[in-house]
């Protein structure tokens, strides 16, 4: 899709949203067509690094013990230790709250079997299974990447909605993020953006602004 048309849609989305007493998020909505999404190879399951960043921090949880847990704690991340992990396996309500409150999960590799057993049923359907890392990993580069990343997982749905930033970001920054996501969609399919029936940008409390094809 043409960069100018994406930018125009971002600008229009702003005009369609009334000012609120909170900073509204901006989303890209994409409606796919002529794809058999019961076939796994046609589904979109991607982590996309946004060129303009997310504009705000995303909550990250680290499932770890020992030095890795201490490193995560020093970075101000949510830390889930082994004993807490075992408890979460018994308390689905709390597990769901943690899953919904965090955008990404990182897990010490040797704890992954326990993660799968305890949190897998909650994280798996949300597309949030942890990124495994060794016990001596430096978390900083991975955390920095996740702070600029959004995840898409269409499963068998033809429509997906994904965060591209918030209203305090410039139109150009938001448009660049939207374009990066559409480029991933284009590269996924042999016919590229032909499979995009329609696309929109939208603020939290505003109407959707169509991106002209």
Curated annotation (Swiss-Prot):
**Briefly, what is this protein's role?**
Binds directly to 23S rRNA. Probably involved in E site tRNA release. Protein L1 is also a translational repressor protein, it controls the translation of its operon by binding to its mRNA.
Q: Describe the protein's quaternary organization and the partners it interacts with.
A: Part of the 50S ribosomal subunit.
| GO BP | regulation of translation; translation
Question: What GO MF annotations does this protein's record show?
Answer: rRNA binding; structural constituent of ribosome; tRNA binding
UniProt xrefs under HAMAP family:
Ribosomal_uL1_A
Q: What is this protein called?
A: Large ribosomal subunit protein uL1
Record family assignment: Belongs to the universal ribosomal protein uL1 family.
Q: Cite the PANTHER family for this sequence.
A: 54S RIBOSOMAL PROTEIN L1, MITOCHONDRIAL, LARGE RIBOSOMAL SUBUNIT PROTEIN UL1M
Q: Which InterPro entries match?
A: Ribosomal_uL1, Ribosomal_uL1-like, Ribosomal_uL1/biogenesis, Ribosomal_uL1_3-a/b-sand, Ribosomal_uL1_arc, Ribosomal_uL1_CS
Q: Which UniProt keywords apply?
A: Repressor, Ribonucleoprotein, Ribosomal protein, RNA-binding, rRNA-binding, Translation regulation, tRNA-binding
Q: One GO CC term of this entry?
A: large ribosomal subunit
Q: Does the keyword Metal-binding apply?
A: no
Transcription regulation found in the keyword field:
no
NCBIfam families on file: PRK04203.1 (NF003244)
């Amino acid at each position: 899709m043409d960069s100018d048309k994406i930018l125009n849609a971002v600008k229009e989305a702003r005009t369609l949203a009334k000012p609120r007493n909170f900073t509204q998020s901006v989303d890209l909505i994409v409606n796919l067509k002529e794809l058999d999404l019961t076939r796994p190879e046609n589904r979109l399951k991607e982590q996309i690094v946004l060129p303009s960043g997310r504009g705000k921090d995303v909550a990250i949880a680290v499932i770890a013990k020992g030095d890795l847990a201490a490193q995560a704690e020093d970075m101000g991340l949510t830390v889930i230790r082994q004993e807490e992990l075992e408890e979460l396996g018994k308390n689905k309500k709390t597990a769901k709250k943690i899953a919904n409150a965090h955008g990404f999960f990182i897990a010490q590799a040797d704890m992954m079997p326990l993660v799968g057993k305890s949190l897998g049923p909650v994280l798996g359907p949300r597309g949030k299974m942890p990124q495994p890392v060794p016990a001596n990993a430096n978390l900083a580069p991975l955390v920095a990447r996740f702070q600029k990343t959004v995840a898409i997982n269409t499963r068998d749905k033809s429509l997906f909605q994904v965060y591209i930033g918030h209203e305090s970001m410039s139109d150009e920054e938001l448009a660049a993020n939207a374009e990066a996501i559409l480029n991933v969609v284009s590269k996924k399919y042999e016919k590229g953006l032909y499979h995009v029936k329609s696309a929109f940008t939208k603020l939290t409390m505003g109407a959707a602004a169509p991106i002209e094809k």
